[in-house]
Amino acid sequence: MKVRSSIKKIDQDDQIVKRRGRLYVINKKKPRNKQRQG
């Protein structure tokens, strides 16, 4: 998982989700696109 100060969608299938006050990017087709903000 990449930890970044600002997260952006890399791929069309990326989904931005807010969990426990943190923003995450999840992608079931390409798990290497996972990101977390902060």
Curated annotation (Swiss-Prot):
The answer on whether this UniProt entry bears the keyword Ribonucleoprotein reads yes
Q: Which Gene Ontology cellular component annotation is one that this UniProt entry carries?
A: ribonucleoprotein complex
Taxonomy, superkingdom: Bacteria
The record's GO molecular-function terms, alphabetically, read: structural constituent of ribosome
What UniProt keywords are attached to this protein's entry? Ribonucleoprotein, Ribosomal protein
GO BP terms: translation
Family to which the UniProt record says this protein belongs? Belongs to the bacterial ribosomal protein bL36 family.
Which HAMAP family did the record assign? Ribosomal_bL36
Name of this protein: Large ribosomal subunit protein bL36A
Q: Give the organism, scientific name.
A: Prochlorococcus marinus (strain MIT 9515)
What's the source species' lineage? Bacteria, Bacillati, Cyanobacteriota, Cyanophyceae, Synechococcales
State the encoding gene.
rpmJ1
